[in-house]
Amino acid sequence: MRRVVVTGIGLITPLGTGKEKTWKNLLDGKCGIDKITAFDTSEHTVHIAGEVNDFNPEDYIEKKEIKKLGRFSQFAIAATKEALADAKFEITPENAERVGTIIGSGIGGLDIIEQEITKLVEKGPKKVSPFYIPAAILNMASGNASIYVGAKGPNKTVVTACASGTNSIGDAFQAILLNKADVMIAGGTEATVTPSGIAGFANLKALSTNPDPKKASRPFTADRDGFVLGEGAGILVLEELEHAKKRGAKIYAEVVGYGETGDAYHMTAPSDGGEGAARAIKMALEQGNIKPEEVGYINAHGTSTPANDKNETQAIKTVFGEHAYKIGVNSTKGSTGHLLGGAGGIEAAFLAMAIDEGVMPPTINQDNPDPACDLYYIPNKAEKRDIEVGLSNSLGFGGHNAILAFRKYKG
């Protein structure tokens, strides 16, 4: 039986470019959400987002190539390079066919679509860039990342809205189990802090209208009123255990379970009581031969919307019963905002680092408890805990539920 471990992490987030900066700021309870700087929001109802303000694409990509890439692809390439460097793994002609890439995105090149549609309307069809389509289509998250690092194994992009990154990592885990690859580059990326992105989610009444950027994303609280849009990418290097051991790789955690279900309920709302999420959690536990009482930490989807947080809390209680109250449950979206298709990538990385270092990041802005959300949400301060098993939950529009289970690696 093949086993799969996490050996590399690359992060580009509103908390900073690079794993170390993001992780430190997360543990310190910092918030990467602020007033939007990418465009004028004066005519919008929402003025805040989690932007990646310290990202310079030229640190990762040749200047002449940047204009051919949507921002979501730039993030994916950068996080992939960061993850491979962290794993100390070099792709060579000899191993390239055994290295695959699965990077999800919920929306793709929205910045490119806006830019080129504006040209089409204002200047006519001849002014539309020949790079419009390849820069915008979602599969270029994986396509471009694989091109830039030379990975020739399984290559695809998963599109399941806010579950995209988690499904990508789960599918990569299965690819290694099935011996389709020895190493997989997997995660999610998103760049939708754009005029139409903000307007679309705002008009859907999905976004918080709280004017205070540092307090607006407040998962599980009584006065939560919607999520805050974020951008960035999170990429993991997954590796077959013996392959990793042979090269002396650092192991963050072992990937042991993956659950995926559908609600068949509503386009944007979760099923009542989180029924679909509960089934996905059970599926991940069963694959990993995990006893419910072994789970010590859950990185919840925790979007800060009234419906999600209540129903996800109920799903956790349905699966774990009284043990649910002993689990540290957090939502790191209070700090990063919601990266949509990128969320599962960064949150799986947070789970792996939490297990590796024995520390649970906080859920910030916990100052107004909701009686319907009554679990232990690691309020406001990081907490040390020896984590045997942890979960990362992602639940997407369309009723997509994806759960990853990681275990502390002990040999």
Per-region residue spans from a language model:
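Phosphate/pyrophosphate-binding loops at sites that engage ATP/ADP/AMP, CoA/4′-phosphopantetheine
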Residues: 83-95, 244-249, 281-297, 319-323
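Active-site-proximal alpha-helical scaffold in enzymes
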Residues: 76-88, 138-142, 146-190, 228-249, ...
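Acyl-CoA/ACP chain-elongation machinery
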Residues: 180-225, 258-272, 302-309, 326-376
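Conserved small-residue
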Residues: 8, 26, 80, 101, ...
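Glycine-/small-residue-rich "gating" segment that lines the acyl/pantetheine channel
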Residues: 123-129, 167-170, 174, 190-246, ...
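Condensing-enzyme catalytic core mediating Claisen C-C bond formation in acyl metabolism
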Residues: 3-7, 31-34, 212-288, 297, ...
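ACP-dependent fatty acid/polyketide chain-elongation machinery
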Residues: 1-63, 242-252, 350-363, 407-411
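Conserved beta-ketoacyl condensing-enzyme motif
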Residues: 6, 30-160, 189-198, 294-308
